[in-house]
């Protein structure tokens, strides 16, 4: 929109938590819905995901409909993946490294609510496989990062969280 402020990159998200660049330089986010309607999406300048007109399958915490009650609409950008019930996605990262060679290019997403690390295998921009790497083992997962060797580090949102390091069984 020509009348938009230049400072506004995009609109229509409720509570974006994680953001990462794909190997192709595209921007991806995780977004909290209300009661359901969390999503993984690709963003570009000027786009609108539709919050608070649509709820991506979720409802308000009170149980009432979001906006006009539509989950999705052709008027707005659609997410790549949405979750109902909510998983409370927090962070995401595209894997690149030597520690988990088969994971190169895959997306890793942390979940606060279900306390899991999710791996999404991507091929030509499409999700072709989903795998929960671990669940309910260390707490509510807040952040994930990868060092230059490809080692994966995770932190929870607990006050005295340790930094957890994932290791491959093959290395």
Task: Go through each PLM region and give its residues.
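Beta-propeller domain segments
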Residues: 1-131, 139, 149, 161, ...
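Short glycine-rich catalytic loops that host catalytic nucleophiles or stabilize transition states
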Residues: 135
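Blade-level signature of beta-propeller repeat domains, shared across WD40, Kelch, NHL, RCC1
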Residues: 143-171
